[in-house]
């Protein structure tokens, strides 16, 4: 069970790295092969972060554990791949944007009253508070954009490394 949770959390990190910087050479072939086994193109993060996530992780994990015997290599790769699918799903770095969201406004934590002589009473802020407005809606177009091969592979490696540490 713990392995599955870590694998899913790691899989959620598939889409932000845009280069192979920091990915150990021992991992490259395993990752490339796992992406193909999962049925995705190396540059297709929509596939890697979606329907093929479990298949890619299942294919890459035993290979990486065998090929990368240095724990430091696994840890380094995990830090590089961290956050990739989350970033992809949030629309970061050439990723497909997420659909629009309408969030209700948060209530003020306490009422405020004007202060005499332009001072700010304790417990209030001079700058506007970061609360949402119920009348505001953020709309973002949906779609996908090609990603470079390194970004997809780095994210998958981060997933597999996290899974390995959970064992």
UniProtKB/Swiss-Prot annotation:
Keyword RNA-binding: no
Alphabetical list of InterPro entries matching this protein: Extracellular_membr_CFEM_dom (IPR008427)
Alphabetized UniProt keyword annotations: Cell membrane, Disulfide bond, Glycoprotein, GPI-anchor, Heme, Host cell membrane, Host membrane, Host nucleus, Iron, Lipoprotein, Membrane, Metal-binding, Secreted, Signal, Virulence
Annotated disulfide bonds: 26-68, 30-63, 40-47, 49-85
GO CC terms, sorted: extracellular space; host cell nucleus; host cell plasma membrane; plasma membrane; side of membrane
Domain named CFEM: residues: 18-112
Covalent lipid sites (GPI-anchor amidated glycine): 143
Membrane topology listed for this record: Lipid-anchor; GPI-anchor
GO molecular function terms noted in the UniProt entry: metal ion binding
Binding of heme, residues: 44
Pfam family, one: CFEM
Subcellular locations according to the entry: Cell membrane; Secreted; Host nucleus; Host cell membrane
Signal sequence coordinates: 1-17
Glycosylation-annotated residues: 117, 135
Single biological process term from Gene Ontology: biological process involved in interaction with host
Induction of synthesis: Induced during infection of poplar leaves, with highest expression observed four days post inoculation.
Propeptide segment residues: 144-167
Family, similarity comment: Belongs to the RBT5 family.
Role played: Appears to function during host infection, and may play a role in suppressing the host immune response.
Record's comment describing the protein's domains: The CFEM domain is involved in heme-binding and contains 8 cysteines and is found in proteins from several pathogenic fungi, including both human and plant pathogens. The CFEM domain adopts a novel helical-basket fold that consists of six alpha-helices, and is uniquely stabilized by four disulfide bonds formed by its 8 signature cysteines.
Name of the protein this chain belongs to: Effector CFEM8
């Amino acid at each position: 069970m713990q392995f599955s949770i870590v694998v899913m959390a790691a899989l959620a990190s598939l889409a932000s790295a845009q280069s192979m910087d920091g990915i150990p050479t021992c991992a490259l072939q395993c990752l490339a092969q796992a992406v193909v086994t999962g049925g995705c193109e190396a540059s297709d993060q929509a596939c890697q972060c979606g329907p093929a996530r479990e298949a890619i992780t299942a294919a890459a994990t035993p290979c990486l554990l065998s090929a990368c015997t240095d724990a430091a290599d696994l840890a380094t790769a995990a830090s590089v791949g961290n956050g990739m699918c989350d970033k992809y799903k949030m629309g970061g770095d050439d990723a497909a944007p997420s659909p629009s969201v309408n969030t209700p406004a948060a209530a003020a934590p306490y009422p405020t009253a004007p202060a005499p002589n332009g001072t700010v009473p304790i417990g209030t802020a001079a700058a506007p508070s970061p609360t949402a407005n119920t009348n505001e809606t953020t709309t973002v177009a949906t779609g996908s954009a090609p990603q470079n091969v390194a970004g997809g592979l780095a994210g998958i490696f981060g997933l597999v490394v996290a899974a390995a540490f959970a064992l």
